[in-house]
Amino acid sequence: MNQAIHFPDREIWDENQQTVCFPVLVHGMQLTCAITGETLLRRFGGSDPLSVFCENRWDLEEEASDLIRDQQEDDQGWVWLS
């Protein structure tokens, strides 16, 4: 893992957006990463998106790291996994 990119264990389920959101620190600056519950369940199966996220955390954090290195933030500074 790149030491300049750190993922604290503070993921949440955002009911309004139907999304798992998880913070990331990039050189000390906080960004938000997100993946929809629908995408999580389609990719990994299961029935509870937050549990599925936790079970697949390492792969999802690696994917988010790649997007961050490629500067794939949206206009709001969020990094969306698909």
Residue ranges of model-derived segments:
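Short, charged/polar N-terminal "headpieces" of proteins
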Residues: M1-P23
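Acidic, low-complexity intrinsically disordered segments
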Residues: N2-H6, G46-S82
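Solvent-exposed, flexible loop/coil residues
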Residues: D9-E11, Q17, I35, F44, ...
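A short, structured beta-strand/loop element
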Residues: N16-F44
